[in-house]
Amino acid sequence: MEKVQQTIRAPRGTELQTKGWVQEAALRMLMNNLDPEVAEKPEELVVYGGIGRAARNWESYNAIVDSLKTLESDETLLVQSGKPVAIFKSHEDAPRVLLANSNLVPKWANWDHFRELEKKGLMMYGQMTAGSWIYIGTQGILQGTYETFGEAARQHFDGSLKGTLTLTAGLGGMGGAQPLAVTMNGGVVIAIDVDKRSIDRRIEKRYCDKYTESLEEALAIANEYKEKKEPISIGLLGNAAEILPELVNRNIIPDLVTDQTSAHDPLNGYIPVGYTLEEAAKLREEDPERYVQLSKESMTKHVEAMLAMQEKGAITFDYGNNIRQVAFDEGLKNAFDFPGFVPAFIRPLFCEGKGPFRWVALSGDPEDIYKTDEVILREFADNEHLCNWIRMARQQVEFQGLPSRICWLGYGERAKFGRIINEMVANGELSAPIVIGRDHLDCGSVASPNRETEAMKDGSDAVADWPILNALINSVNGASWVSVHHGGGVGMGYSLHAGMVIVADGTEAAAKRIERVLTSDPGMGIVRHVDAGYDLAVETAKEKGVNIPMMK
């Protein structure tokens, strides 16, 4: 990948570079994904998650920008793995952009084949929100991480992480949310990363409190704050596959253990034991096969240590990076003895059609987001947990790129909020249109047997019809852009998932599209879980009037 040193920043204000606000939204969100405040390696078009890119290469990026600038309001741009391939006449209620990223026929859906295609310039890895142009920085996963640790606290620690120590690793674009999510729940956390730049970035953005290169110092600080029952987050420079076994040997067992290293990609995401970043980069280039094998061996040691900690009493869970699968394939037959975070903590929310709903102020004015915060606090005042999240986010979350907010809203709530936002744009309360979207990690848009659909009640973990149906219904209902991706979160061969974005531009046409899309999208989550036999989903469907032909 050619590196290009240029600073990309989304335009602000109300002056259009395109022929309509929906096209403008797509352009600004693509550019926002590559803002240095947002992206992990913008010079390589990498947004987050190892090699999750916004466009296939710089030539494709420039062609996408040019296409969006000339796209009519009754045309649709097609993007194939980060490359613009066609513009067709459609209609004003159709999506302005349709994206398909990283999709491979199942028999060939593996990293080796993907890398062959990538080398030839035929494919890119879109992760989830990188290639679908709706990444908002670490805040994008923060509330989900907060909810996960909050539910762990409710199940195991009397509702709070006060006086507990969490041990984790991985402080990239996704994992970087962990330190703040733990301290928001009152706990102490040691978060390990091999890359000092990642820790520095989290400290700079106020997601992490302290930095150290010493395990002894990290433990001393952690013990001090644990005894005081005060929250603190410590970024520890090192390799988790070395540090976790060392702690097991010393019989130092945390209360909670998880991991968010980029284990989904053994070549580009994980650093083997005994290698500096520079040495790893050299080996990756010279002998990728040996690199991958060393990575897998290190991951196996990492998982062995997590299992040992679980055996000694630590609440241990997988945070969706496929590290258990790698260890299992390497011969560690009990790798799946600790659960994934979705079946352990999140699935009841999915049954209610809840998931990570986000919105972005295209104006670039933080005041627009603060006004929408007030809407949440007013309209959902009976949901104290949600309101508490909004108040904490306002105080503690620093915007990256265009101002944005995330919160978990359910069926009915999303459409209600979307209607209000559109009205606020129409009457001038907000200074420019708002982009509404979500992560692909949502209640009805993913098939991922080692993550979102792990341990489904009816055994339908690997059924991938659901994300396809999700993308189809959102497209016909008028989402502004819709994406279908493969391999996000857990790597090639292990997931299919869909994303959607809808623009609230204040028009009556947008109001109708918002009502349709923000009903069908979370509705798919309820439908998917009703079909799998979850009683809570059935109750929710009946209460909300979701029409499911064979529901009993």
UniProtKB/Swiss-Prot annotation:
Pfam families (UniProt xref): Urocanase, Urocanase_C, Urocanase_N
Active site: 407
Compartment(s) where it occurs, according to its Swiss-Prot or TrEMBL record: Cytoplasm
Name of this chain's protein: Urocanate hydratase
Keywords: Cytoplasm, Histidine metabolism, Lyase, NAD
GO molecular function, a single term: urocanate hydratase activity
NCBIfam families in alphabetical order: hutU, PRK05414.1
Stored PROSITE patterns: UROCANASE
Keyword check for Acyltransferase: no
Family designation: Belongs to the urocanase family.
Enzyme Commission (EC) number: 4.2.1.49
Organism of this sequence: Bacillus cereus (strain G9842)
Enzyme class: lyase
GO cellular component, one term: cytoplasm
PANTHER family: UROCANATE HYDRATASE (PTHR12216:SF4)
Cofactor note (record): Binds 1 NAD(+) per subunit.
Keyword Secreted: no
Predominant place of localization: cytoplasm
Catalytic activity: 4-imidazolone-5-propanoate = trans-urocanate + H2O
Family matches, as SUPFAM superfamilies: Urocanase
Protein task: Catalyzes the conversion of urocanate to 4-imidazolone-5-propionate.
Residues where NAD(+) binds: 49-50, 127, 173-175, 193, 239-240, 260-264, 270-271, 319, 489
UniProt cofactor(s): NAD(+)
